């Protein structure tokens, strides 16, 4: 009898543990983009902006999601933090895609300052019970290998420390490829935006399921 009871408890605990360990799907209906010119649609007509393409991609896949683009060309992490309160006033936001930091790197802002700003942004967003997808950036070597190392460590560390969703590099498959960038070699062209949209869509669908 004792053996039967122990077996019952054993299997009950297994079922309970497995049930608790499954990550619950997220209900996402409204997404806000918080970034700089890499996400704002710099140099492109409005119908080619990331918010339009990403929303279309998601809708065509059966996800009724609205995308609002609050990215501003030239913004640093400090600028994003300064206008965050206005962004948090947008009603019924389920997810914010945070893609700031590229201009910090171009301006040589100390990585610890960028990290501090992004951490404050993340904390304030989480306080509103809004999910975050952190889109990482990578530095060039123009400011030295030490700067690059410190900058590149910002995003994975923030993701880990805050337990938030993470897409390691916003410009994955786009950066340094002339076929996917405008003549300045920095900002994505329409084909580049489409690739970014595909990559972000995969991350969004992954956190919904």
Please place each PLM-identified region on the residue numbering.
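Bacterial N-terminal signal peptides that target proteins for export
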Residues: 1-9
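Serine-esterase "nucleophile elbow" of acetyl-processing enzymes
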Residues: 21-75, 79, 83-92
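Alpha-helical cap/lid subdomain in secreted, periplasmic
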Residues: 26, 81-209
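C-terminal motif of bacterial Sec signal peptides marking the signal peptidase cleavage site
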Residues: 17-19
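N-terminal start-of-chain detector that recognizes signal peptides
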Residues: 5, 42, 68-70, 138-140, ...
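Short hydrophobic/aromatic segments of transmembrane alpha-helices and their interfaces
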Residues: 5, 61, 175-177
